[in-house]
Amino acid sequence: PEPSIRTVSLPHRGKGNAVREGLILANGKIRLMCDADLAMSVEQIDKFLHKMAEGYDVVIGSREVKGPRRFDEPKLRHFMGKIFNWYVRIVAVGGFSDTQCGYKCFTSIAANILFKRQKLDGWSFDVELLMMATRKSMKIFELPIDWYHKERSKVSFGPASIQMVRDTLLTRI
Protein backbone atom coordinates (compact mmCIF):
# COMPACT_ATOMS: atom_id res chain seq x y z
CA PRO A 1 0.00 0.00 0.00
CA GLU A 2 1.06 3.56 -0.62
CA PRO A 3 2.04 5.73 2.33
CA SER A 4 -0.69 8.06 3.50
CA ILE A 5 -0.84 11.07 5.75
CA ARG A 6 -3.69 11.95 8.05
CA THR A 7 -4.05 14.71 10.58
CA VAL A 8 -5.33 14.24 14.09
CA SER A 9 -6.62 17.04 16.32
CA LEU A 10 -6.05 16.58 20.04
CA PRO A 11 -6.60 18.75 23.09
CA HIS A 12 -3.32 20.30 24.25
CA ARG A 13 -1.99 17.96 26.93
CA GLY A 14 1.73 18.10 26.18
CA LYS A 15 4.21 16.80 23.64
CA GLY A 16 4.35 13.34 25.23
CA ASN A 17 0.60 12.95 24.88
CA ALA A 18 0.58 14.15 21.26
CA VAL A 19 3.41 11.84 20.22
CA ARG A 20 1.86 8.87 22.05
CA GLU A 21 -1.54 9.36 20.41
CA GLY A 22 0.00 9.87 16.97
CA LEU A 23 2.23 6.82 17.09
CA ILE A 24 -0.53 4.60 18.44
CA LEU A 25 -2.80 5.71 15.58
CA ALA A 26 -0.06 5.25 12.97
CA ASN A 27 -0.18 2.00 11.05
CA GLY A 28 3.15 1.78 9.24
CA LYS A 29 5.72 -0.95 9.86
CA ILE A 30 8.21 1.81 10.71
CA ARG A 31 7.11 4.90 12.62
CA LEU A 32 9.20 8.06 12.75
CA MET A 33 8.54 10.93 15.13
CA CYS A 34 10.06 14.29 14.32
CA ASP A 35 9.82 17.74 15.80
CA ALA A 36 7.51 20.07 13.90
CA ASP A 37 10.24 22.71 13.58
CA LEU A 38 12.28 20.34 11.37
CA ALA A 39 15.50 21.00 13.27
CA MET A 40 16.78 17.92 11.45
CA SER A 41 16.68 18.04 7.66
CA VAL A 42 14.41 15.49 6.01
CA GLU A 43 17.39 14.26 3.98
CA GLN A 44 18.60 12.52 7.15
CA ILE A 45 15.54 10.26 7.39
CA ASP A 46 17.26 7.70 5.14
CA LYS A 47 19.89 7.19 7.85
CA PHE A 48 17.13 6.12 10.25
CA LEU A 49 15.61 3.75 7.70
CA HIS A 50 18.99 2.12 6.97
CA LYS A 51 19.50 1.43 10.68
CA MET A 52 15.96 0.06 11.02
CA ALA A 53 16.72 -2.28 8.10
CA GLU A 54 19.68 -3.60 10.13
CA GLY A 55 17.23 -4.95 12.70
CA TYR A 56 17.00 -2.25 15.34
CA ASP A 57 13.74 -1.88 17.26
CA VAL A 58 14.37 1.79 18.07
CA VAL A 59 16.71 4.33 16.46
CA ILE A 60 17.13 7.66 18.24
CA GLY A 61 18.65 10.77 16.76
CA SER A 62 21.57 12.15 18.72
CA ARG A 63 23.32 15.49 18.74
CA GLU A 64 25.86 14.27 21.29
CA VAL A 65 27.48 11.14 19.87
CA LYS A 66 30.55 11.56 17.67
CA GLY A 67 29.87 12.98 14.23
CA PRO A 68 26.89 15.35 14.20
CA ARG A 69 27.06 19.07 13.58
CA ARG A 70 24.98 21.64 15.46
CA PHE A 71 24.03 24.89 13.79
CA ASP A 72 23.21 28.15 15.61
CA GLU A 73 22.59 26.55 18.98
CA PRO A 74 23.01 28.92 21.95
CA LYS A 75 25.79 27.76 24.27
CA LEU A 76 23.51 27.85 27.34
CA ARG A 77 20.99 25.52 25.68
CA HIS A 78 23.74 23.05 24.75
CA PHE A 79 25.16 23.18 28.28
CA MET A 80 21.74 22.66 29.89
CA GLY A 81 21.08 19.73 27.57
CA LYS A 82 24.35 18.09 28.61
CA ILE A 83 23.47 18.58 32.30
CA PHE A 84 19.99 17.08 31.81
CA ASN A 85 21.36 14.04 29.97
CA TRP A 86 23.95 13.54 32.73
CA TYR A 87 21.08 13.66 35.26
CA VAL A 88 19.06 11.15 33.19
CA ARG A 89 22.00 8.71 33.07
CA ILE A 90 22.27 8.82 36.87
CA VAL A 91 18.59 8.86 37.83
CA ALA A 92 16.73 6.97 35.11
CA VAL A 93 18.46 5.23 32.22
CA GLY A 94 22.14 5.02 31.33
CA GLY A 95 23.82 4.41 28.03
CA PHE A 96 22.41 7.31 26.00
CA SER A 97 24.14 10.57 25.12
CA ASP A 98 21.01 12.43 24.02
CA THR A 99 17.57 11.32 25.17
CA GLN A 100 15.81 14.56 24.20
CA CYS A 101 16.50 14.83 20.48
CA GLY A 102 13.08 15.04 18.82
CA TYR A 103 13.79 12.40 16.17
CA LYS A 104 13.12 8.76 16.96
CA CYS A 105 12.13 5.78 14.84
CA PHE A 106 10.33 2.62 15.98
CA THR A 107 9.22 -0.66 14.49
CA SER A 108 5.45 -1.05 14.72
CA ILE A 109 5.92 -3.75 17.36
CA ALA A 110 8.17 -1.54 19.50
CA ALA A 111 5.85 1.46 19.08
CA ASN A 112 2.80 -0.55 20.14
CA ILE A 113 4.55 -1.96 23.21
CA LEU A 114 6.07 1.34 24.33
CA PHE A 115 3.41 3.92 23.53
CA LYS A 116 0.55 1.89 24.98
CA ARG A 117 2.43 1.88 28.30
CA GLN A 118 3.83 5.43 28.21
CA LYS A 119 2.33 7.66 30.92
CA LEU A 120 4.22 10.99 30.84
CA ASP A 121 2.53 13.75 28.84
CA GLY A 122 5.30 16.35 29.12
CA TRP A 123 8.77 16.90 27.70
CA SER A 124 10.40 13.94 29.51
CA PHE A 125 8.37 11.24 27.81
CA ASP A 126 11.51 10.32 25.81
CA VAL A 127 13.26 9.24 29.01
CA GLU A 128 10.30 7.05 29.94
CA LEU A 129 10.26 5.43 26.47
CA LEU A 130 13.99 4.68 26.51
CA MET A 131 13.77 3.29 30.03
CA MET A 132 10.94 0.95 28.98
CA ALA A 133 12.73 -0.06 25.76
CA THR A 134 15.89 -0.86 27.72
CA ARG A 135 13.94 -2.92 30.28
CA LYS A 136 12.26 -4.82 27.42
CA SER A 137 15.75 -5.55 25.95
CA MET A 138 14.90 -3.80 22.70
CA LYS A 139 17.73 -3.24 20.26
CA ILE A 140 18.40 0.54 20.29
CA PHE A 141 20.82 2.59 18.16
CA GLU A 142 21.85 6.19 18.83
CA LEU A 143 22.28 7.80 15.40
CA PRO A 144 24.35 10.97 14.90
CA ILE A 145 22.31 13.67 13.17
CA ASP A 146 23.02 17.23 12.16
CA TRP A 147 20.75 19.61 14.02
CA TYR A 148 19.67 23.18 13.30
CA HIS A 149 18.57 25.37 16.21
CA LYS A 150 15.20 27.02 15.59
CA GLU A 151 14.22 30.09 17.63
CA ARG A 152 10.46 29.47 17.54
CA SER A 153 10.52 26.90 20.31
CA LYS A 154 7.40 26.46 22.45
CA VAL A 155 9.52 25.42 25.44
CA SER A 156 9.55 27.84 28.36
CA PHE A 157 13.09 27.16 29.57
CA GLY A 158 12.71 27.55 33.37
CA PRO A 159 9.35 25.85 34.03
CA ALA A 160 10.07 23.12 31.45
CA SER A 161 13.41 22.32 33.11
CA ILE A 162 11.78 21.91 36.52
CA GLN A 163 9.02 19.71 35.08
CA MET A 164 11.57 17.57 33.22
CA VAL A 165 13.62 16.96 36.38
CA ARG A 166 10.45 16.04 38.30
CA ASP A 167 9.07 13.81 35.53
CA THR A 168 12.38 11.98 35.18
CA LEU A 169 12.18 11.10 38.86
CA LEU A 170 8.63 9.81 38.28
CA THR A 171 9.92 7.31 35.70
CA ARG A 172 11.54 5.42 38.57
CA ILE A 173 8.26 4.95 40.43
Language model feature labels by segment:
Residues 1-8:
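Acidic donor-binding segment of Leloir-type glycosyltransferases
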Residues 10-25, 30, 42-123, 150-162, ...:
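Acceptor/aglycone-binding surface of glycosyltransferases and processive sugar-polymer synthases
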Residues 38-39:
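Acidic metal-phosphate-binding loop of nucleotide-sugar-dependent transferases
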Residues 95, 117-121, 130-148:
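Catalytic donor-sugar/metal-binding loop of nucleotide-sugar-dependent glycosyltransferases
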Residues 127:
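Short alpha-helical elements of helix-turn-helix
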Residues 167-173:
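C-terminal, non-catalytic tails of nucleotide-sugar-dependent glycosyltransferases
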